[in-house]
Amino acid sequence: MNAAERYFQAVTGILQTVMTQEQDALSRAADLLIEKLKEDRVIHVFGTGGHSIMGAMEMFQRAGGLYPINGIFPPGISVTDSHPNTERLVGYAARILDHYGVRSGDVLLLINVNGINAVTIDAAIEAKQRGALVIGVTSREFSEGVPPETPARHPGKLNLCDLADIVIDCHVPPGDAIVDIPGVTHKVASASTFPVVLIVNSLLALTVERMAQQGLEPLVRGSANLPGGRERSLKIQERYRGRVVHQY
């Protein structure tokens, strides 16, 4: 097999592992989201790293998603406006959760593949101290493969997988890249975006399915690029003004 074929094989293997081993976690997470949506709460979603943020973006303001999703996108976290040290800044997460209105009784979906940086760990700790519940999308294998003294780690040497109330494991190996090329020192082609996107969309699908089975009408977002889509969105979004920070 060439490198592209080996990459495809490795990625599909990870996806199969997620769907085989994470059904219980997905089920419990979906039930928790339904509970909070019944209480008319928004679901806070925070990707706490330069690429993990894409998992939160996948759930936010996108056709097929839910309207009451409060995407958390603070300055300095995405690869377009970040400094490598921003996600390692102790104390930043508390101010972020203040700004985005994470409160007692809420649920925070935290997405970070390595699960070790300061913003990730502080966000989990701070949310729980406020009385919120935390769903973590992360790789236990990656977290446990990072030595305690690695500079990227939170000073407390903690892992997201040990703090979250529900952990959905994305099963990404340490280092993220998965293809060996003869003669090249480092592996190439990162894997993590695929299982993270699979997890968040599977969680959305399961949540909506169960709501419908319970006779509830989930507020699913249609495409703004189809006739009437934008007009419908503007109407529904009024319900969440002030609670979904980045509505447009």
What would you call each of these model-derived segments?
Residues M1-T20:
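Generic N-terminal amphipathic, Lys/Arg-enriched alpha-helix
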Residues Q21, A25-R28, I43-V45, A212-R221:
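Flexible, glycine/charged-enriched surface loops at secondary-structure junctions
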Residues Q21-K38, I96:
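A short, well-structured juxtamembrane/interface segment
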Residues I34-D40, G49-I53:
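Long amphipathic N-terminal alpha/beta scaffold segment
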Residues V45-L204:
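Glycine-rich phosphate-binding loops that contact phosphosugars or nucleotide phosphates
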Residues E149, D176-D180, V184-K187, E209-L234:
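Internal, active-site/partner-interface "lid" segment
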Residues P227-Y248:
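Acidic, Ser/Thr-rich low-complexity intrinsically disordered segments
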